[in-house]
Amino acid sequence: MKNSCFIVLFLLGIIPSAFAQLIGFEEEVPEAFKVSGKGEVKISSLFYKEGESSLEWDFQPGSTLDVQIAPLSLNTRNEKQFGITLWIYNEKPQQDSIRFEFLNKEGEVSYWFSYRLQAAGWRACWISFEYMQGDKKDKKIVAYRLVAPQRKGRIFLDRLIFPEKKMNLRTTPDQQLPTNNGLSNRDLWHWCLVWKWEQQSYDIPLPSKLTSEQKKELKTIEQRLTDFLEVKKAPQGPINAAYKTFEKAAISPSIAGTGFIGTPIVAPDEQDKKKGEMSWNDIETMLSGFAYDAYYNQNETSKKNYFTVFDYAIDQGFAYGSGMGTNHHYGYQVRKIYTTAWLMRDAIYKHPHRDAYLSTLRFWAALQETRQPCSPTRDELLDSWHTLLMAKFISAMMFPDAREQAQALSGLSRWLSSSLRYTPGTIGGIKVDGTTFHHGGFYPGYTTGVLATVGEYIAFTNGTSF
């Protein structure tokens, strides 16, 4: 009996429990994590997404990081809810993947998925067993492993939860995991579709050159937007808030020679405010406050801080091709990122990271959706009009090439016009009797601000071909 108790206690000490808990890799490598083949695993402070350290895996071609777990029994019901969540730091974009494999007691692969390494920085890795590959015949899992690509390299892991027993229903497909959600829920028909829309191409051709009238119209729209967004003097409150938040962010370059360390930035669903973690609203606070100070007061420190924050936000996952695990309702927290980016546009154009900034702004504005007309069954239109129409407009106007501005504005105006049709059933939008629906029902109070935003866009483009 004593021996049995000892074995149970020993196993509990070295094998992660079937009851999920976040592993932050703060002190030592858990006993359950072992490397097979050439390579090494260790605790590192070079990068972290929680606490002050992460798990560094230095791998060689074909090596694996093996993790023993308490047996996990899946079935057709709980495999929809169960999964794995973690964040992975990749230092350099690659054209390969890390393969995750989940094994039965015979060591056979029952479930697997590939995590693409095409981006640098912290990116989320969230996926339920439902959306993994594999024959899924044996649903009793006793271990999982990460399989290295056919090269030498390293990645960093943090914020690991396995098994996650209540996967976020709004898990967002992105460049890293494009098939981690079936997107069958109508509430997902806009926040979580940003990567799907990224696969679309414009059917409006890029003009070889603009006419003098088109150039004049773009200048008119540009001036209207500037007049609308400019204020008489820099608001001191937002500037003070930017510096206060920046101090809490504690951003500094990693001694690895690339990337940063600092306060983690995650989606609100994952944010632990008690630990001081930050989210999109904190990015907005810093970028907008520093932009006001740099633009109106010509404060060089604020200008430097603005780009430091932008670089850090991208490194943390607020970037092109990233869904940050879940991105739902982010539009409410990023509006001023766009309005103040317009004020900073000349400085952005001159910055060596210009393309990264602009691609981030376009991606999170979901401008890519407007490469095609609005789908007749598109739901949640009121959210898009209210929170992201201005972001789309500014992103379209911030193409350095005026020809691309014209193409993007043409696509956006067409998309908006096609979205203002009457929508069927309980699909969000405008109904034949003049009422509006949102979240599948009558939603009059929200509509005032929504239609005001649409009216602003009409005013910006009024009297032009756009």
Annotated model-derived regions:
Residues 4-14:
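Sec-dependent N-terminal signal peptides
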Residues 19-38, 173-174:
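Extracellular carbohydrate-recognition regions
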Residues 43-64:
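Short carbohydrate-recognition loop motifs
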Residues 54, 83, 143, 158-159:
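Extracellular/lumenal ectodomain signal focusing on beta-strand-rich modules
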Residues 57-134, 151-153:
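Extracellular ligand-binding interfaces
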Residues 136-139, 148-163, 167-173:
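Extracellular carbohydrate recognition
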Residues 170-241, 245:
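Extreme N-terminal leader/anchor segments
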